[in-house]
């Protein structure tokens, strides 16, 4: 919700309120993540004992997690600060900050884990400290930029200021969080269906899921960069440009995902053999790669439409879309396909579900744009 709210305010040239909302957002993240970190710190023993950790292993878990929970605040705040930067139109700096954090972590890890010269090796505790330091550098960098660019107020807000400005973030953020929580549930249900076809099918499905995260990386990048562009134009009441940005992103993702599908199709044999020597698993990985990625473009349409709805402050529409895609189309289509045509039917069902939902998503957003344009005309 941070990017959508601040983008709209900046688009309407309401910089004063944009600064207040940005500050309220960072304070909210600080409070929520701080609370979760305290709870996590207190419950290290019971949680990991439930997970089967031995007393010897608990010592190492304490060394790592006690520092990780403290450092979690240093991760959450830069992520939120990066959303503010993206909302202002800067998409490069957030990438640089995250990349720098990764580089610092990679440099400090061997130094603090194994030691060097006067620096004594700390083992797994050193790994946690290296991660926390890398996140801390990112936090300092983000805060300096936000203050320097006048995108936040360099003080804590008064209680009344905080409550007034945080409401809009929760209005969009809570439904968006709910939509994100539904995806692993649906994937878990489909994984259970896949399990009926044996261990080889589960292994192939797992490999497919990892390949999907790589194949859809451009889609995920667009889902983060499109909302600020739409929000700013929405705030400036330039609805025609909102639709142009949305439609351009849709055409691009369909084309790029078609190219990615073609590449995966051509190299499916090679990739399958890289992952496994088992012939049965390899054949199912090939089956996955020659069917499921065909629907990634349609999936991208749904994902970008969800982002666009959030950007124009229609979070419930995005939640409804995600619910429909997962539980009215994806899970039922996969289940019916598996009954009628086995594992191939399940894969085809996933593609059909994404395709049908993509068409519905596009038509719904186009209708919403028409409503906004009519409202704009009537006001003028």
Predicted features and spans:
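Short membrane-interface helical motifs at transmembrane helix boundaries
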Residues: 35-66, 259-282, 286
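Transmembrane helical elements of multi-pass membrane transporters/channels
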Residues: 67, 78, 101, 134-138, ...
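Residue-level recognition of pore/gate-forming positions within transmembrane alpha-helices
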Residues: 24, 33, 37, 101-103, ...
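Small-residue-rich hydrophobic transmembrane alpha-helices
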Residues: 1-38, 75-94, 191, 204-262, ...
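Interhelical loop/hinge segments that connect adjacent transmembrane helices in multipass membrane
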Residues: 124, 128-131, 143-183, 371-380
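Hydrophobic alpha-helical transmembrane segments
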Residues: 64, 97-111, 119-150, 344-367
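Helix-terminus/linker motif at the lipid-water interface of multi-pass membrane proteins
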Residues: 48-55, 111-122, 181-214, 232, ...
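Alpha-helical transmembrane segments of multi-pass membrane proteins
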Residues: 55-81, 219, 279-302
């Amino acid at each position: 919700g941070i990017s959508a709210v601040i983008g709209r305010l900046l688009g309407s040239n309401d910089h004063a309120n944009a600064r207040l909302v940005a500050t309220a957002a960072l304070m909210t993240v600080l409070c929520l993540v701080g609370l979760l970190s305290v709870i996590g710190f207190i419950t290290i023993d019971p949680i990991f004992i439930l997970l089967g950790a031995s007393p010897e292993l608990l010592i190492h878990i304490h060394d790592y997690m006690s520092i990780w929970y403290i450092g979690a605040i240093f991760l959450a705040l830069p992520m939120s600060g990066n959303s503010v930067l993206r909302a202002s139109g800067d998409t490069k700096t957030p990438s640089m900050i995250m990349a720098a954090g990764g580089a610092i972590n990679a440099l400090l890890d061997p130094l603090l884990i194994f030691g060097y010269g006067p620096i004594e090796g700390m083992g797994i505790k050193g790994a946690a400290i290296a991660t926390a330091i890398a996140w801390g550098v990112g936090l300092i960098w983000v805060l300096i930029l936000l203050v320097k660019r006048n995108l936040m107020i360099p003080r804590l807000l008064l209680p009344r200021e905080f409550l007034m400005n945080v409401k809009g973030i929760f209005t969009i953020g809570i439904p968006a969080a709910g939509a994100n929580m539904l995806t692993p549930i649906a994937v878990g249900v489909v994984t259970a269906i896949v399990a009926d076809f044996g261990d080889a099918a589960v292994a192939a499905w797992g490999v497919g899921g990892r390949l999907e995260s790589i194949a859809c990386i451009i889609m995920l990048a667009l889902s983060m960069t499109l909302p600020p562009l739409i929000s700013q134009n929405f705030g400036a009441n330039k609805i025609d440009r909102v639709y142009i940005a949305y439609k351009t992103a849709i055409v691009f993702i369909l084309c790029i995902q078609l190219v990615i599908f073609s590449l995966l199709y051509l190299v499916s044999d090679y990739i399958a053999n890289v992952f496994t020597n088992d012939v049965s698993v390899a054949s199912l990985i090939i089956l996955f790669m020659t069917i499921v990625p065909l629907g990634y473009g349609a999936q991208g349409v749904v994902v970008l439409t969800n982002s666009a709805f959030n950007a124009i402050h229609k979070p419930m529409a995005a939640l409804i879309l995600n619910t429909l895609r997962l539980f009215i189309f994806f899970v039922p289509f996969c289940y019916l396909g598996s009954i009628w045509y086995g594992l191939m039917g399940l894969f085809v069902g996933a593609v059909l579900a994404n395709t049908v939902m993509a068409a519905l998503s596009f038509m719904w957003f186009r209708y919403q744009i028409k409503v906004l344009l009519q409202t704009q005309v009537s006001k003028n």
